[in-house]
Amino acid sequence: MPRECELCGTERAVLRRPKTGDLVCRACFFHVFETEVHQTIVEAQLFRRGDRVAIGASGGKDSTVLAYVMKTLNERYDYGLNLFLLSIDEGITGYRDDSLETVKRNQEQYGIPLKVLGYKELYGWSMDDIVASIGRKNNCTFCGVFRRQALDRGAASLGVDHIVTGHNADDMAETVLMNVLRGDIARLERCTDIITKGPDGVDGDEDDDETEGCGAGRSGFGGSGIRRSKPFKYAYEKEIVMYAYFKQLDYFSTECIYSPNAYRGYARAFLKDLESIRPSSIIDIIHSGENLHVAGQVKRAVQRTCTRCGYISSNELCKACVLLEGLNRGAPALGVRSDKSRAVREARLDGTSDIGRTIPRWEGVQRSSATAW
């Protein structure tokens, strides 16, 4: 016999919420999901009226639901935000080209302006080119670093104040586990922050080993001058999928063809096992991360700017410039190694090799020339 919704008591329940265990009807599920995201936004004071906000749009379930919910809440609660879709084309044939078609449909469905910025345009290399050169061992490192800087540069060209990404509660919990397993104490303290912060913007929410430029200081601002936040910080992945399903949203569901062996996948599998035993494990891990405090003697990176492209970095050269130089020299391993390694130091001293194309100079947020399509 169908059971009634435990919230309204009148409609037939269609699902049991993974997050709370409540049996809810479709309308109540939509309401509580959207209300919880709104509460997260308000309590964290993510936006200011008049902000220009870029939604990182990949065409996947998280960013598609985020775009829909941001548009809905902006209208319902009169946030006064100017919303944009920002997509990064990594140049992955059979994956990103297809997902971008979904993003373009979302643009029409939601009526939100879209900007697309490609790796080929910015770096002179697509991910297909990079994988052909280096193989699949470290490709997530290259992609994560390049994507992060590309997002900032795309946002700057739009003249936005804020970037929001679709990282959900599962992603946050996975990141805590990854940083524990890697022994990355400095990153562990700030990896659950809803607003990206840290001396060099390292928040560890991607599969790469080095990240830079997302923000700095406790305000969430960094050398880019653009805030980043995660409105879905407490939203379970399963509930995002259910929301997309019941709303019949148009999203792309294929995983990246180059990421089957990414380190994050192992943390994800472990987390799913924990969740099957104790559904609250996801939120419990996030709260544990939030309550961690790093001892004062832990060395923190000093914020600088890249001497080559001007982007924020904790080293003389930002990680994107280091990786790009390695690719252009025909020695991509140089970019993956530590800046303190002998091979890297010798390469830096070698002025005879052509470093090839460099990244355009960082010009900051360009409000006067901001454009989207």
From Swiss-Prot:
It is found in: Cytoplasm. Its EC number is 2.7.7.-. Pathway: tRNA modification; 5-methoxycarbonylmethyl-2-thiouridine-tRNA biosynthesis. It is an enzyme of class 2 (transferase). Plays a central role in 2-thiolation of mcm(5)S(2)U at tRNA wobble positions of tRNA(Lys), tRNA(Glu) and tRNA(Gln). Directly binds tRNAs and probably acts by catalyzing adenylation of tRNAs, an intermediate required for 2-thiolation. It is unclear whether it acts as a sulfurtransferase that transfers sulfur from thiocarboxylated URM1 onto the uridine of tRNAs at wobble position. Prior mcm(5) tRNA modification by the elongator complex is required for 2-thiolation. May also be involved in protein urmylation. Belongs to the TtcA family. CTU1/NCS6/ATPBD3 subfamily. This is Cytoplasmic tRNA 2-thiolation protein 1. It comes from Malassezia globosa (strain ATCC MYA-4612 / CBS 7966).
